[in-house]
Amino acid sequence: MDLFKCLKYIKNNLDDFILTAIKNTSIQLEDVQRDQMQVGENAEGNTIGKLRDADYAKRKKAKGGIAKLGVVDLKNTGDFYDAIFAKVESKFIEISSSDFKTNFLEKRYGEIIFGLNDHYKKKYFEILVPEIINLIRKYLKNGSRP
């Protein structure tokens, strides 16, 4: 295989390598989204919201909540977290939850409850970049396209 042609193909199709890598690591992306929510942060790096009931906040913290005292983490029963998904279609990545409370929570706290802030993007990139490199290596080794 001609190295120049291979490199040109990679350059022209880098989006495909990246999207395939995101599909391959979508479960880890979902996990990173949950990790971000557990500390009570939204996609902008701000707190999701504040709990209005101080006693409830103390009970949540006593149960092992990771978020700072009084910060919303969107976790009560765990159903909302369990239903979080990451879906890649074409060049669009959707992170959401199939739980029935999703619309209510988005209206209350904003659609920015989904999506990674800069800190958690870095955490996810630590997973994603090696996968992109792996796909490129496979292509260079045996012509396996994403």
Regions found by a protein language model. Give the residues of each.
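Short, Lys/Arg-rich flexible segments
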Residues: 1-146
